[in-house]
Structures are given as structure tokens and as C-alpha cells.
């Protein structure tokens, strides 16, 4: 299936509830919305990237172009990433950033707003839905079920970047991510605990059996904790998050978000 190319997006600077500026963009649907099966009216998909990501990167623009064949797409940079202000808190105050993006989607006039998060963004999407119930459906891709996981080499490296002064310097210079030196106080509830409060909002958990960051136990724990309506998709050969997600899987996720109830 050929994916239509995106035109220049509408960009905006959003303001999170704690005053941090959030760089965001809006891509309208690239096809006639009437040709898509959508539950409840015009659809916006709000995309939450993973740690060190940015909506301006090629991987996220590809995702937006695929999703735009189903509905409008709102993308944004979490605090400490790209052109957004502030410093990354790696999944804590990022809930406020997603809240600002969701609010913008509603302000744009969409009648159905759903969130799609990858890795850290998946954890944020789960927490946002459980805390605020402001969306119609949630998809969490390659997300962790708990904090401080160090069971894989990539996650041990990630914790070095987050927790060590030299690591944060590398994060700023090489990964273009500004990371807060302050620890969590208090520690936010882990995603698997918040997942239990998402219902009645539909939750889709997607995980690859080739994920090198978080093994399948994370997806299984999230699914076990959540109440209905919920679905778990284990994808053969899929690696981790937005850089690995294939177009056909994105289309399936978008179709699920468009109709889940």
C-alpha cells in the first residue's frame, strides 16, 4: 500500500500545565475522512515518542504519514527533547506534555481523540489515560510495566545516560536530550498500577517478541493489570518502538484506535 506524502504540517508551541513550552505539529488526514471507519466522528491520533525521540525525525514523520491515512495526527516533543523547553523527567511530568497535546487535538475540533505511545511514550500514555480519562482509546507500543528496569543491556545503558553526570552530558550533546539531574520525588506510580484505572477507555498493548529493551513480561504484566476493554498483540519479529514498527502494524493500530469502544 502506497502512503501519501505529508504536506507541511501546522506547527504550534503548546504550554504544559507547569509552564513548559512544548513543540508540536498537526498533520490533517491525507485522505477523505468519510472513507475511513471511525467510531464517533472525526479522528485525531496523538503520538507520544520514546526517550531521545522527536516529531521532526524521519522515523516519526514516517509514522505520521502512515497514521494520516486514517485520521489527523498530532505529534509533539516531550520536554527536554528537540525544540521543547524544560528537561526530561523520563516519564513523570511528561504526562503534562501529553495532556497539552491532547487538549490541542480537542481544540482543533476533532470528535474522537486517541493516544499512541512508544516506549517511554507508551508509559506516559498509560499514565495519562489512567489519571485523566480524556481520550477515547489508548495504544501502548513497546512500553515498560515498571520503573528502573535494568534487565537488558540497552536499558542498563539508558540508566547510565539518565543517572550519571557524564551520561547526561552525552545525552545532551550526542542524543540532543536534556535530562533533569533531579530524581523523582515522589516516585510516580508505575504503569502497571495505573493501567488498572484506564477502564472504561479501551487499551491496546503491542509488543514485539524481538524487543531488546523490554521483554514480553512487561506487556503481559500491563495486560494482566488492566481491566476490560483491553487487547494484547504480541508481534513476531518486531523489535522496539518507533524506529522498528512496520507500516502494516501502524495501519492495524490506527484502525483499532478508530473503532475501539
Residue spans for each PLM region:
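N-terminal cap/lid segment of alpha/beta-hydrolase-fold proteins
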Residues: 1-37
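The serine-hydrolase catalytic nucleophile loop
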Residues: 51-64
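Conserved alpha/beta-hydrolase
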Residues: 64-85
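Alpha/beta-hydrolase active-site loop
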Residues: 89-108
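Hydrolase active-site cap/lid region
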Residues: 133-184, 201
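Short beta-strand/loop motif that positions the catalytic acidic residue
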Residues: 198-199, 205-207, 211
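Conserved alpha/beta-hydrolase "acid-adjacent" motif
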Residues: 212-218
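Catalytic histidine-centered segment of alpha/beta-hydrolase-like enzymes
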Residues: 238-248
Amino acid at each position: 500500500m502506497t502512503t501519501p506524502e505529508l504536506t507541511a504540517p501546522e506547527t504550534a508551541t503548546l504550554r504544559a500545565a507547569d509552564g513548559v513550552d512544548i513543540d508540536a505539529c498537526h498533520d490533517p488526514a491525507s485522505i477523505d475522512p468519510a472513507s475511513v471507519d471511525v467510531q464517533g466522528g472525526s479522528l485525531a491520533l496523538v503520538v507520544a515518542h520514546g526517550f531521545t525521540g522527536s516529531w521532526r525525525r524521519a522515523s516519526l514523520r514516517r509514522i505520521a504519514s502512515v497514521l494520516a491515512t486514517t485520521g489527523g495526527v498530532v505529534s509533539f516533543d516531550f520536554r527536554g527533547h528537540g525544540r521543547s523547553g524544560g528537561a526530561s523527567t523520563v516519564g513523570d511530568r511528561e504526562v503534562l506534555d501529553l495532556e497539552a497535546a491532547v487538549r490541542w487535538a480537542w481544540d482543533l475540533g476533532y470528535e474522537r481523540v486517541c493516544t499512541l505511545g512508544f516506549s517511554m511514550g507508551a508509559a506516559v500514555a498509560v499514565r495519562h489515560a489512567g489519571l485523566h480519562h480524556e481520550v477515547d482509546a489508548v495504544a501502548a507500543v513497546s512500553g515498560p510495566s515498571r520503573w528502573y528496569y535494568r534487565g537488558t543491556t540497552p536499558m542498563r545503558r539508558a540508566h547510565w545516560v539518565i543517572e550519571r553526570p557524564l551520561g547526561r552530558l552525552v545525552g545532551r550533546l550526542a542524543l540532543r536530550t536534556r535530562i533533569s539531574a533531579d530524581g523523582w520525588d515522589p516516585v510516580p506510580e508505575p504503569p502497571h498500577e495505573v493501567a488498572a484505572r484506564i477502564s472504561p477507555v479501551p487499551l491496546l498493548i503491542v509488543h514485539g517478541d524481538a524487543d531488546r529493551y523490554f521483554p514480553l513480561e512487561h506487556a503481559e504484566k500491563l495486560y494482566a493489570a488492566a481491566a476490560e476493554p483491553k487487547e494484547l498483540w504480541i508481534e513476531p519479529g518486531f523489535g522496539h518502538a518507533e524506529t522498528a514498527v512496520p507500516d502494516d502494524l501502524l495501519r492495524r493500530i490506527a484502525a483499532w484506535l478508530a473503532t475501539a469502544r
